[in-house]
Amino acid sequence: MERAFHALVDGGRVWLVDPLDGPEMEDAAALGEPAGVLQLLDRHNRDCATIAARLGVPHLKVPDAVPGSPFEAIAAVRLPRWRETALWWPARKALVVAEVLAANPMHTGGRERVGMHLFLRPWPPQSLRGYRPEHLLLGHGHSVHGPEAGSGVETAYARARRDLPWVLKGLPGSVRG
């Protein structure tokens, strides 16, 4: 599954979202003064703690708020085994989502630009509905920009239940069992 991380820059400060340690980290850290590492999904440990310690910045795991930042934290999912926060950046009209929405075949079934996570399709969480981003930054798959970003969110919700059989059919054999 294609994984992505994001470096969000505002006022010379950089917030690293669900980062992966690799060559890209040097480029991300060079964008400005590191302000924090944000882990938006409880199980997206990735390299968050290591990177935060190395940079000497806070590691905020599934935060309810991001103090000193331009982001609004959204409680995307709050279930016993799934805690996820999304970020809304009003000034940039950017929505950052770790797992609820993604742009990879496991989420989309190959039919949608953006799709809902398989396990959430029967009862989609309503927390992200209504946001009309111009930039949709995702934890899996390529980000979506422009009018497709907002319509991608709405389409993912509108087709969540209806396309569930199609998504299940498209899962790789190793996942189906």
Regions found by a protein language model. Name each.
Residues 11, 34, 54, 131-132:
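Structured helix-beta-strand junction loops
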Residues 22-68:
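Active-site metal-binding motif and surrounding structural segment of the metallo-beta-lactamase
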Residues 13-16, 79-177:
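Metallo-beta-lactamase
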Residues 9, 51-53, 79:
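A generic structural signal for short, solvent-exposed coil/turn residues
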Residues 2, 23-25, 43-47, 66-67, ...:
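Active-site environment of divalent metal-dependent phosphoester hydrolases
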Residues 1-3, 71, 82-84:
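Short beta-strand-initiation
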